């Protein structure tokens, strides 16, 4: 009996919660698609670094589970609210509360099963698209077919059970505490209004604004090249985020009353068209769902940050490769074994050119003082002739120095230590004063020297008599290198790279060897992982926000139908009525997005202080922010349009 009733009710209510069903189905489809890709042997074989994809996905899925739990729990509450009188009537007819609880649970499980049944074929199709994106990001000219596997299906079922067990336990707990009266009047309840005193509300609103501004200033103060790499920066950023969260919730709990107060004080605006009705409707809703608005703003903020971070990560790909491995093969070791390295490489590759260069010690460490001198007590020096040979191999402009000049090559992250630094405008080498001609960051790479974050380029005659610190070998091959070459070098030269000290401890010095092909593969894999996972997170979060607002609005279209029927009886035609509804929904959807968009823009502008040194363009982030904002509004507007259509349908049905 209960089963038939649950099936009938589920079939009847699917139309009202179609948006919710679509979002849950899409969420499970994405989870299943990414699990299929992560557990695919074909994807893992593409790149050794793709093993990290599975571990990263597991961590992301934990976040997604909480978001879907929040979504389903919130929607279940509204489904329960809409049918509370019906359930209360069942109790009046003598049906036990326990049986009513089972009825509601069965209905929710049926909806969930429908979602997961639809999710498997949709997720399978979507996994082919995800694999295509990953293959393109990896730059591999082939198409992969992702096959179904029981591990991914099993994980999907585990996630499904975890989510629904948590949601349904919470629902059963709520039902167990309710009486017949609670059931009959449950649809009259809302979130409690947090502030009834206008003075207290105004103080909270102003303090929240101030706290938000302070948090963003704190965030900006740490996002500089000077501070970003300091150990305490993470603590400051966490404090800033906590303050921002408090600020967003504070603004969300007070903005509705502030909005209404401003409107009521402006008589011209107050009585213009439908402004008063829209403002009153929004305020009555926002006052009772202020905490929800805060949560939705946080979800939008996270989604925008995820979209922008994935874009910046993709843009920094070429720069990261050149920063770690600008040459086909680069290594530093004893000169005596360079020929052995060359023989290993020649077994499979044709060598076009080799460059040997030395790093020398300048004992006065006049520049090192500004680059954390506690690590080394000398300045690493490179001969001008060697530097020009390196530049020539990379097809970069050559450098010329007079006898009284020197040059600095450093990481872009530390350019601020050199720029406008009067203390290093002149240094003394071999009892002669040398003036700083300039500095360069484009020709720098991380293993140009192992003894610092910069090198001093001197005319050749000044390195005579200086102690040699390191011996480096650069190899240019005719063919493009790959990760297998790096593995081969490390395996064949293990006797040189892996050493045992006097205490019997093994020291693996494989970091001495860098192969460009391996670095390209690793960076492409990292870009593929970051871009796909962060887009996945953003889509789920935006969909969750859109669904909650849609369900909330559609519930109101039924709950407060008398408002719109009254407007019709007062002579408002359908065109004007639907315009009012559009305006009402537009405000409802925009309010949680405004603060999130502003905060995300300020935070990305601050992070750009760091990333512009890497990207080489201080305005590039604006283009990415604009494009990602378009993506956000495209997804968000789909929910707004669907909500508007459903709202109109409910109003017309009631009429």
Feature map (PLM): residue ranges:
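Nucleotide-cofactor and metal-assisted catalytic machinery
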Residues: 320-528
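Peri-transmembrane interface segments
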Residues: 15-21, 33-63, 78-81, 89, ...
């Amino acid at each position: 009996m209960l089963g038939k009733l649950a099936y009938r009710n589920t079939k009847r209510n699917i139309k009202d919660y179609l948006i919710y069903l679509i979002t849950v189905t899409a969420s499970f489809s994405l989870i299943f698609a990414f699990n299929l890709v992560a557990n695919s042997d074909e994807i893992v074989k593409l790149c050794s670094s793709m093993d990290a994809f599975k571990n990263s996905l597991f961590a992301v899925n934990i976040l997604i589970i909480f978001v879907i739990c929040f979504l389903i729990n919130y929607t279940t509450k509204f489904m329960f609210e809409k049918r509370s009188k019906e359930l209360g009537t069942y109790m009046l007819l003598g049906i036990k509360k326990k049986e009513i609880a089972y009825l509601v649970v069965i209905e929710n499980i049926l909806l969930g099963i429908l979602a997961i049944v639809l999710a498997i074929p949709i997720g399978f199709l979507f996994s082919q698209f995800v694999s295509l994106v990953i293959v393109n990001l990896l730059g591999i000219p082939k198409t992969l077919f992702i096959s179904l596997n029981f591990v991914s299906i099993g994980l999907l079922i585990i996630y499904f059970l975890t989510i629904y067990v948590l949601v349904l336990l919470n629902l059963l707990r709520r039902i167990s505490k309710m009486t017949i009266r609670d059931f009959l009047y449950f649809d009259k309840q809302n979130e409690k209004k947090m502030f009834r005193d206008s003075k207290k509300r105004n103080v909270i609103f102003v303090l929240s604004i101030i706290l938000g501004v302070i948090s963003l200033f704190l965030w900006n103060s740490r996002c500089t090249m000077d501070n970003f790499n300091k150990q305490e920066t993470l603590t400051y950023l966490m404090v800033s985020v906590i303050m921002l969260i408090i600020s967003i919730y504070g603004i969300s709990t007070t903005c509705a009353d502030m909005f209404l107060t401003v409107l009521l004080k402006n008589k011209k605006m107050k009585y213009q068209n439908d402004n008063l009705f829209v403002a009153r409707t929004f305020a009555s809703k926002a006052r009772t769902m202020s905490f929800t608005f805060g949560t939705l703003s946080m979800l939008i903020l996270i989604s925008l940050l995820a979209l922008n971070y994935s874009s910046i990560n993709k843009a920094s790909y070429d720069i990261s490769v050149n920063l770690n491995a600008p040459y086909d093969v680069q290594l530093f070791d004893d000169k005596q074994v360079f020929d052995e390295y060359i023989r290993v490489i020649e077994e499979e590759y044709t060598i076009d050119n080799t460059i040997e260069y030395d790093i020398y010690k300048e004992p006065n460490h006049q520049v090192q003082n500004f680059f954390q001198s506690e690590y080394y007590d000398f300045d690493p020096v490179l001969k001008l002739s060697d530097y020009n040979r390196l530049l020539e191999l990379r097809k970069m402009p050559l450098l010329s120095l007079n006898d009284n000049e020197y040059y600095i090559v450093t990481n872009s992250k530390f350019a601020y230590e050199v720029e406008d630094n009067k203390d290093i405008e002149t240094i003394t080498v071999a009892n002669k004063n040398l003036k700083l001609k300039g500095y360069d960051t484009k020709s720098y790479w991380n293993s140009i020297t192992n003894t610092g974050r910069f090198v001093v380029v001197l005319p050749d005659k000044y390195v005579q008599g200086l102690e040699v610190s390191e011996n480096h070998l650069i190899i240019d091959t005719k063919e493009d290198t790959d990760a297998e070459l790096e593995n081969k070098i490390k395996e064949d030269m293990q006797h040189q790279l892996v050493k045992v000290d006097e205490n019997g401890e093994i020291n693996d010095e494989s970091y001495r060897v860098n192969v460009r092909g391996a670095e390209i593969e690793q960076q492409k894999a990292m870009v593929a992982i970051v871009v796909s996972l962060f887009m996945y997170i953003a889509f789920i979060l935006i969909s969750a926000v859109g669904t909650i607002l849609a369900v909330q609005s559609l519930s109101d279209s039924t709950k407060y139908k008398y408002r719109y029927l009254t407007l019709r009886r007062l002579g408002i035609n359908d065109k004007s009525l639907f315009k009012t509804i559009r305006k009402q929904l537009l405000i409802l959807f925009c309010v949680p997005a405004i603060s999130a968009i502003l905060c995300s823009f300020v935070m990305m502008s601050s992070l750009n202080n760091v990333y512009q040194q890497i990207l080489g363009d201080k305005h590039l982030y604006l283009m990415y922010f604009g494009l990602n904002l378009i993506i956000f509004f495209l997804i968000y507007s789909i929910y707004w349009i669907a909500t508007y259509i459903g709202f109109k349908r409910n109003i017309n049905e009631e009429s």
